[in-house]
């Protein structure tokens, strides 16, 4: 929105269906020769929705010359991602969602695109030659990394990547999928619990929930007394909550450090009865 305001751009949003999957027909109707960028989430951080990325990339490329940006913050920690196979142009990843430290992430992009772009910030280590009247930039990626880098965070993120690689992302994905099925079966049996999830096998292990008559923050605090960590709020998707007529939800996400969500579901059931 800030870029759109600065450069007089028009932003359009893709609808979702009743199962919270992207409406592909609506996407097709939005594309034109004027479309410059298409950006979608690889996995929804609220409904767990997993779009068919390759299909969507093919549709976008057939109808426009737009660059395709994949938000992989929720996807990359849970599943193996092959950027070459997907055919995307850029991939954005958040470090803290994949066992890394806060304050650091990764933006992968095709090299020819990086080479064609100018630096956003100026500072040390991003220059090649400096003269009184001009400067030349260092090769990618250095020209985009001005100043002292967050080397402590980078080392931490590297260790997290090595850790997950040693486990194998296929193993991580299988564990996440098994947690999803277990959690789905448990949560569906709790009366009064509204589950915002596609409830299909083509989804991640992310469950946003609400209980009628109880605020998400209160539920979160109650679950905390059981030692259960969930997040309460709008999870960076206020328009989505507004569409569902919800002020907030509480969200549980299974990961490699979870063995099951039995305690979480039982605690939510007790909170519902309270």
Regions found by a protein language model. Give the residues of each.
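Single conserved hydrophobic/aromatic residue that forms the stacking wall/gate
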Residues: 263, 270-274
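Pyridoxal 5′-phosphate
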Residues: 1-266
